Amino acid sequence: MACCVALCCSVPTGPATTICSSDKSCRCGVCLPSTCPHTIWQLEPTCCDNCPPPCHIPQPCVPTCFLLNSCHPTPDLLTVNLTTYVQPGCEEPCVPRCC
């Protein structure tokens, strides 16, 4: 997508700090990972014009220990039965796939 090269990029605002913002020039198509302490991959540059996004935006990936950590407030889950299924061949959880 030549129209997206050398244009300014913008990233979704959130708790993470990225090296690319709307006031800096950067290459569109470079996926930026989140820098927050938890494994959440959801930040990605988008072109300022109407070009389609150059990368597939991966789904947020949160470790189970973060979701079920007792130090975080949990909703009313006392009556919910939790069953964990592990898919074979997934030794590396939360690995983002990008372009």
Swiss-Prot record:
Keywords, sorted A to Z: Acetylation, Keratin, Repeat
Annotated GO MF terms: structural molecule activity
Biological role: In the hair cortex, hair keratin intermediate filaments are embedded in an interfilamentous matrix, consisting of hair keratin-associated proteins (KRTAP), which are essential for the formation of a rigid and resistant hair shaft through their extensive disulfide bond cross-linking with abundant cysteine residues of hair keratins. The matrix proteins include the high-sulfur and high-glycine-tyrosine keratins.
Superkingdom, natural source: Eukaryota
Chain spans, region 3 X 5 AA repeats of C-C-X(3): 3-59
Residues with N-acetylalanine modification: A2
A GO CC term assigned to this protein in UniProt: keratin filament
Residue ranges crossing the lipid bilayer per the database entry: none
The keyword Coiled coil is annotated on this UniProt entry: no
Protein name: Keratin-associated protein 3-3
Spans of repeat Sequence: 3-7, 8-12, 47-51
Family indicated by similarity: Belongs to the KRTAP type 3 family.
Alphabetized Pfam families for the sequence: Keratin_matx
Subunit structure: Interacts with hair keratins.
Keyword Transmembrane in record: no
